Amino acid sequence: MTVSENSVLETEVLVGGSAMPNERPGAMEPQKLSKMPEGFPRRSTVANGVRSRASRRFLVVGGALLLSLFAIYEMGAVFSIGGITPLEYLVLALFAVNFCWIALAFCSGIAGFLILLRKPRAKDLQVTELHTRTAILMPTYNESPDRVFSAVSVMAETLSQTGHGHAFDWFILSDTTDPDIALLEEQAFLVLRQETHKHSRVYYRRRRKNVARKAGNVADFCRRWGSRYDHLLVLDADSLMESSTITGLAQRMQADPDAGLIQTIPSLINGTTLMARLQQFAARIYGPVIGTGLGWWVQKEGNFWGHNAIIRTEAFMTAAGLPNLKGKPPFGGHIMSHDFVEAALIRRAGWSVVIAYDLPGSYEECPPSIIDLAVRDRRWCQGNLQHSRILPTKGLHWVSRLHLLTGIMAYLSSPFWLMLILTGLMLALQAHFIRPEYFTDQFSLFPTWPIMDSDRALRLFYITMGVLFGPKVFGVLLLLKDGEFARSVGGRIKAIFSVIFEVILSALIAPIMMFIHCGAVMSILMGRDSGWSPQRRDDGSMPWMTLIYRHRWHMLAGVMLGYAAILDSLTLLAWMSPALIGLWIAVPISAWTGSVKIGEVFKRAGILATPEERNPAQICLQAHEARAAYQKHIAEPWTLAQVLKDPALMELHLAMVDKQPLRAAGTPIEAMEAIVHVKVHEARCQQSALAVLNRQEMAMVLANPLMLRSLQKLPEQFVEEDLVSFC
């Protein structure tokens, strides 16, 4: 059968036409990191786009540098009165690294605070018609199909009502490896097509092999279909976006031909556990301060967070092809945290990368528990540390390098903070147990007393706490100033209670996360790869024994640090207690914060409430209703046995299988594919074949029409006369 005949057959089988449109192949070559590609950077074509002003960088980065130099000088002065020892030099160095990290966030927060005081409004571009085409991509990997497909259904329907639906196509790009979920996705896609085919173009493709994970998934789309579209709007499996935001992004791209990528700042929604609600509240109250400040000073040298952003296809395909790094994982191989690197490469090529901090209506969800956060952060930590090999890339803008460095420090800061705590503890124990040398080798009539400037040290402590908690304070001030905002979270009194509770609970969780990040860094330095595990989205609860096992080292570390502190004095133990209590009760904290029931208690009490929870956007309500409907639609899942038995079901399934050519005859065959071929061809019936195929092999069979046809030809069961089976 020819390709055209096959397409006609699919159109007849599937409501709304083929599962994917005709391919229009395009090149997306891996970029060279050691030298600038020819013709880069491109020249700007218009003067009405975003400009980068050095004055903003000077105010924020320069301010952070001056603040850091002052703090480092003060810390040096604390030690210098009696002469600085080697251990004190180490404390000074660790303090310098950690303070620079928080000073930049503080200065960005000041900028964001001042901007938000004026209540900026989203820019009205006055564009009435879109003449560009945008592909909206929803990558998914072993996610709940009811969540993914219902979200697309609602977004597609609301977008069609704006009159701009003709400018957008929707693509669900699956990398699912679980055969049961893969079949559920197909069922959900049939429902989605039935609902949307009259007003929207919605497509589905599941890759046979998920090479390079999410980045490879999007790159595969670009190479095969990307040339059909001017822009790519990339979502995540838990993303939602209002139609006004979708059209606003496309209009901004259309109005600024220099724009290569525009990133929104998503709001967190749908948190049911206490941990998820904590993240939602913190992101809603304090997040805009940092995000707005960051967007204000980075300007054309913004960043990409992997989703809820629109990308110019030309910029992405010509400038952001990711190379494989030399060596094996965790530092070699595919680039895991692809988003920062893609943004840096797009900017290197001369396109602008902008953070649209003024554009609302972008949503995502967050991990439901500390353990789920740890699993995600282990993967992110590996990807961000991998960026140490991207930093020397030729031609990157210094702000892009700073983004990469900031991502690295997001995880390296934990070991640095831990080392600072340990060296400070060692200084205290040294002063308590080791007799000081009052007379040095040099002749002196007076002894040398080991002293520090305690008043200056206390003042520096207050300054450090102010810098650390400054962005939180700015967020609270904005909340208290804005009466409408305060009412949207339950009023000022309840908001203050929520802030106090968030600060206390975050302080308890922080040392646990510090040790989790330290463990992740150590694991990576020891050469261990994170793999790619699907994320839990709703319930974060786990058995208590599992939690004890996962937090055993955290509790032990807390006990050991507490014992070391009490050897010096109860005063030192009291000073360290904010960092120790969370470690001592890590297991109950992890259990309680991951509980949906406890999260519901706090929701009813109105603690940690957000505007999106108390007054949800219409699209969020619609998505919730649609998900319940999809759960009913796919309540009776297909099985591979049913697909083989039912010819109509088989034709439906084959119409949704990726049409990428199979391995050509005579070319090398992978081990698993060879094993599956043997199992299929040796099987005497469908039942025996399914009995010997594991889940990974079943997923491969589902994506291979030839194997499916071979299995379909076999009898359902094998019966041999006069043969008696004994159990």
Swiss-Prot record:
Any one annotated GO CC term: plasma membrane
Single Gene Ontology BP annotation: glucan biosynthetic process
Transmembrane annotation, as ranges: 58-78, 97-117, 278-298, 408-428, 460-480, 496-516, 572-592
Localization terms from the record: Cell inner membrane
Stored Pfam families: Glyco_trans_2_3
GO MF, one annotated term: hexosyltransferase activity
EC number: 2.4.1.-
Membrane topology: Multi-pass membrane protein
Segment forming the signal sequence: none
Domain of life, source organism: Bacteria
Region Disordered, residue ranges: 18-41
Pathway assigned to this chain's UniProt record: Glycan metabolism; osmoregulated periplasmic glucan (OPG) biosynthesis
Keyword list, A-Z: Cell inner membrane, Cell membrane, Glycosyltransferase, Membrane, Transferase, Transmembrane, Transmembrane helix
PANTHER family in alphabetical order: CELLULOSE SYNTHASE CATALYTIC SUBUNIT A [UDP-FORMING], GLUCANS BIOSYNTHESIS GLUCOSYLTRANSFERASE H
Job description of the protein: Involved in the biosynthesis of osmoregulated periplasmic glucans (OPGs).
Family: Belongs to the glycosyltransferase 2 family. OpgH subfamily.
Protein name: Glucans biosynthesis glucosyltransferase H
Organism: Shewanella baltica (strain OS155 / ATCC BAA-1091)
